[in-house]
Swiss-Prot record:
Entry keywords, A to Z: Capsid protein, Clathrin-mediated endocytosis of virus by host, Host nucleus, Host-virus interaction, T=1 icosahedral capsid protein, Viral attachment to host cell, Viral penetration into host cytoplasm, Viral penetration via permeabilization of host membrane, Virion, Virus endocytosis by host, Virus entry into host cell
Any one annotated GO CC term: host cell nucleus
Protein name per UniProt: Capsid protein VP1
Gene Ontology biological process terms, A to Z: clathrin-dependent endocytosis of virus by host cell; symbiont entry into host cell via permeabilization of host membrane; virion attachment to host cell
Region entry Disordered, spans: 1-80
Bias kind Acidic residues: ranges: 40-53
Role description: Capsid protein self-assembles to form an icosahedral capsid with a T=1 symmetry, about 25 nm in diameter, and consisting of 60 copies of two size variants of the capsid proteins, VP1 (10% abundance) and VP2 (90% abundance), which differ by the presence of an N-terminal extension in the minor protein VP1. Capsid proteins are responsible for the attachment to host cell receptors. This attachment induces virion internalization predominantly through clathrin-dependent endocytosis. VP1 binds DNA and may therefore play a role in viral DNA encapsidation.
Molecular function terms, GO-annotated: structural molecule activity
Family: Belongs to the parvoviridae capsid protein family.
Pfam families: Parvo_coat
Lineage: Viruses, Monodnaviria, Shotokuvirae, Cossaviricota, Quintoviricetes
Length: 690
């Protein structure tokens, strides 16, 4: 295939020699998990000069020397102080060849990194406090369900995670991809660290004034490790909103790498005791029981598993070219439910007058067998002859989608957890009768995010929540302050508090790619001998009791994978090392059949002083750094073919309130630079599934 043309052609100056040295080192890297075939897409940096002969460049490498050596699929290069490496590219290129669409996503971020609080590995229990003094006659649900207790390993390393759609595409690019393609596949991924800058901080006090001085430290270093073989625990950051930022012109920071310590912890429950009175009352005092089984310790470090590259100011690091092997992801959505599959019944439309398609008078008469009691030809559930055959009890070829038994909460090694199932577009059950309430099936979800991942400082969150639901999210005092139009509390901003976070409810509802019929619960179909029901209360009681008796995932169920969700949705994921693999993922549309792209870790090397000790907190020079992260993600898609006659509004379903007439202005910056990245669902092209 021919190379993709550059978007900004122009005269180039000849590149300095170190560029060719870096290119030669990239070609020399060898690792079975990294793709080394012939490049069919242009080089990652569109501003690089044409490649020299490998042998010639290698000879120059011997003359000039370089930075850190390659390891774990990547390699370091020497750029030299004062020589900038790479560029700043955040464009997305679309190229259509016949029926295929090639999408090349370039991403660049300025990444800030601090020293970790300690260079030690820490293992601790988190998320639980024990109150042994407060006596309660009722148990709070938090004791059993809303439990944060866990044991984790906190490392001194930071993970540079680009596994989210918002890192690679602008809102316009994502919209163009989902309207242009009916299906997409991941092809390759490249990452690079350039322009490493490390500084030290010196603070002096003169009287009551404090002064900070920042100096370049040319001998300080940045450690880089690439887990190509995925030896370490796999920890995608997208589900917690801790990937690289989504706004290219804003600096971002990596999150600290940590993982669950999978030791067995016996769960803690409150100790319930009877009060010594004549009245039969109960009193509960929390008395947690904690026991750790030492046989299950599994402490893993980066230093003894992955070769580490050392970069100084001006050096760079390249991960090599990774080739994906995963199933394609559809970008289609269907309105068909189980009841819409197959050949509709034979009918005779009414022709008395002209009716609109939306009119309830636009009806038809079903054609039944003469002499029978409303009986049609065909295959139906039930064994009673001569009784009515209807659309309700017709046998369908498949079950489209399935419901998961809600509020069944299993307990694992370290506590309880929700084992939620897929969420469909219409996931409510409905009792019969005019006053029937909707009973939600499967779990609803939400996503919390900050300003660097699409939030807007000027958005009043409380205004976006219905009045009757505000008490679920805010205290009475906060609601009272809002009602009194008091100014927002802005200092100090508490990270991920209600002041500095935004919430998108219903995410990712788009992972359900079809409608499912609402379910009416009737005892008549479940218990023989009962002929009538009291509406609507008896029906609603039945619905409440039978929520766990819906169809589950079984051989006749057809179910789609999750679709892309912009901007917070995860892109790819790893399969668990189990004999029987799961067939779908709750977060990512792409599950790698081979090893996924290796996790990229960075850490500032200890910058010691003249005073040395073996304590857990040795003397260190206060150091920070920043570097340019660059990446290129290549996707291939199939050109979308819409079969319907009428034009369709592809973003009719699932688009957030930011796309409405009164709020559309929030997508572009105001006079303070604040704007909001709207939620987009990737599966929006209408298509029949049967």
């Amino acid at each position: 295939m021919s190379k993709i043309p550059q978007h900004y052609p122009g005269k180039k100056r000849s590149a300095p020699r170190h560029v060719f040295i870096q290119q030669a080192k990239k070609k020399k890297q060898t690792n079975p998990a990294v793709y080394h075939g012939e490049d069919t897409i242009e080089e990652m940096d569109s501003t690089e000069a044409e490649q020299m002969d490998t042998e010639q460049a290698t000879n120059q490498t011997a003359e000039a020397g370089g930075g850190g050596g390659g390891g774990g699929g990547g390699g370091g290069g020497g750029g030299g102080v004062g020589n900038s490496t790479g560029g700043f590219n955040n464009t997305t290129e679309f190229k259509v060849i016949n029926n295929e669409v090639y999408i090349t996503c370039h991403a660049t971020r300025m990444v800030h990194i601090n020293q970790a609080d300690t260079d030690e590995y820490l293992i601790f229990n988190a998320g639980r406090t024990t109150d042994t003094k407060t006596h309660q006659q009722k148990l709070n649900l938090e004791f059993f369900v809303y439990d944060d207790f866990h044991q984790q390993v906190m490392t001194p390393w930071y993970i540079v995670d680009s596994n989210a759609w918002g890192v690679w595409m602008s809102p316009k690019d994502f919209q163009q991809m989902k309207t242009l393609c009916s299906e997409i596949s991941l092809v390759t991924l490249e990452q690079e660290i350039d322009n490493v800058t490390i500084k030290t901080v010196t603070e002096t006090n003169q009287g009551n004034a404090s002064t900070k001085q920042f100096n370049n430290d040319l001998t300080a270093s940045l450690q880089v490790a690439l887990d190509t073989n995925n030896i370490l625990p796999y920890t995608p950051a997208a589900p917690l909103g801790e990937t690289l930022g989504f706004v290219p012109w804003r600096a971002t920071k990596p999150t600290q790498y940590r993982y669950y310590h999978p030791c067995y912890i016996y769960n803690r429950y409150p100790n319930i005791q009877k009060v010594a009175t004549e009245t039969l009352t109960w009193d509960a005092v929390q008395d947690d029981y904690l026991s750790v089984d030492e046989q299950y310790f599994n402490f893993i470090t980066i230093e003894n598993n992955i070769p580490i590259n050392i970069l100084r100011t001006g050096d760079n690091f390249h991960t090599g070219l990774y080739e994906f092997n995963s199933k394609p992801c559809k970008l289609t959505l269907s309105y068909q439910s189980t009841r819409c599959l197959g050949l509709p019944p034979l009918c005779k439309p009414k022709t008395d007058t002209t009716h609109k398609v939306t009119s309830k008078e636009n009806g038809a008469d079903l054609i039944y067998i003469q002499g029978q009691d409303n009986t049609r030809l065909g295959h139906f559930w039930g064994e009673e002859r001569g009784k009515k055959n209807a659309e309700m009890n017709r046998i369908r070829p498949y079950n489209i989608g399935y419901q998961y038994p809600e509020w069944i909460i299993p307990a694992g090694l370290q506590g309880s957890y929700f084992a939620g199932g897929p969420r469909q577009w219409s996931d409510t059950t409905k009792g019969a009768g005019t006053h029937s309430q909707h009973l939600q099936q499967n779990f609803s979800t939400r996503y919390i995010y900050d300003r660097n991942h699409g939030g807007d400082n000027e958005v009043d969150l409380l205004d976006g929540i219905p009045i009757h639901e505000r008490s679920n999210y805010y205290s009475d005092n906060e609601i009272e302050q809002h009602t009194a139009k008091q100014p927002k509390l802005r200092t100090p901003p508490i990270h991920h508090s209600k002041i500095d976070s935004w919430e998108e409810e219903g995410w990712p509802a788009a992972s359900g790619t079809h409608f499912e019929d609402e379910v009416i619960y009737l005892d008549y179909f479940n218990f023989s001998g009962e002929q009538e029901l009291n509406f609507p209360h008896e029906v609603l009681d039945d619905a409440a009791q039978m929520k766990k008796l819906l169809n589950s995932y079984q051989p006749t169920v057809a179910q789609d994978n999750v679709g892309p969700v912009y901007p917070w949705g995860q892109i790819w994921d790893k399969k668990p090392h189990m004999d029987h693999k799961p067939s779908m993922n709750n977060n990512a549309p792409f599950v790698c059949k081979n090893n996924p792209p290796g996790q990229l870790f960075v850490k500032l090397t200890e910058n010691l002083t003249d005073t040395f000790n073996y304590d857990e907190n040795p003397d260190r020079i206060k150091t920070y750094g920043y570097f340019t992260w660059r990446g290129k993600l290549v996707l291939k898609g199939k050109l979308s073919q819409v079969t319907c006659w009428n034009p369709v509004k592809r973003e009719l379903i699932g688009e957030p309130g930011v796309f409405t007439k009164d709020k559309y202005h929030k997508q572009i910056p105001n006079n303070k630079g604040n704007f909001e990245i709207g939620l987009q669902y990737g599966r929006s092209t209408i298509k029949y599934i049967y």
